[in-house]
């Protein structure tokens, strides 16, 4: 893969590290793992700090992380709903369908998206990427609403792919 690596493959879920260079070509990143037959993915943003505590050039930024997630979502939502499992997308849809995010961190309580965000419960370096996650949640909200409503009607969320054509 272009700079990304499978660091663990457990129960067929591949953990892929997303580096700065990957965020510049999200469609290539998506099609690359799809062509390799990978059907279940956990995306891990690469955050590395130098001795001064600053992000290294290989690290993703919040803005690029958001754009990357949105571009990946666009690939997935148009062709691969229920065919490829991307953990963040699956977890987000589960939250839209009613699963709650208990006890968000104090600094996350004012965020409109804390109920969806897996990082709202813990202090992690990923909180540096809040703006990216917020952009992703905002962008995907209309699609998530439609998929949630399809599921409530005992229909497949895959029907959204046809609606988007």
Regions found by a protein language model. Give the residues of each.
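Radical SAM enzyme [4Fe-4S]-AdoMet core and its adjacent flexible, acidic
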Residues: 1-99
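Flexible mid-to-C-terminal extensions adjoining Fe-S/redox cofactors in radical SAM and related proteins
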Residues: 100-165
């Amino acid at each position: 893969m272009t700079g990304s690596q499978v660091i663990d493959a457990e129960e067929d879920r591949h953990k892929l590290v997303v580096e700065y260079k990957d965020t510049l070509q999200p469609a290539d990143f998506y099609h690359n793992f799809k062509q390799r037959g990978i059907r279940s993915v956990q995306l891990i943003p690469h955050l590395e700090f130098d001795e001064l505590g600053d992000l290294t050039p290989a690290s993703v930024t919040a803005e690029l992380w958001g754009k990357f997630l949105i571009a990946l979502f666009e690939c997935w939502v148009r062709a691969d709903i229920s065919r490829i499992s991307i953990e963040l997308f699956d977890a987000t849809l589960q939250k839209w369908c009613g699963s709650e995010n208990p006890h968000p961190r104090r600094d996350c309580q004012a965020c409109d998206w804390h109920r969806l965000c897996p990082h709202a419960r813990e202090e992690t370096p990923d909180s540096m990427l809040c703006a990216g996650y917020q952009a992703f949640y905002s962008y995907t909200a209309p699609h998530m609403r439609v998929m949630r409503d399809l599921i409530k009607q005992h229909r497949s969320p895959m029907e959204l792919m046809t609606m988007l054509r």
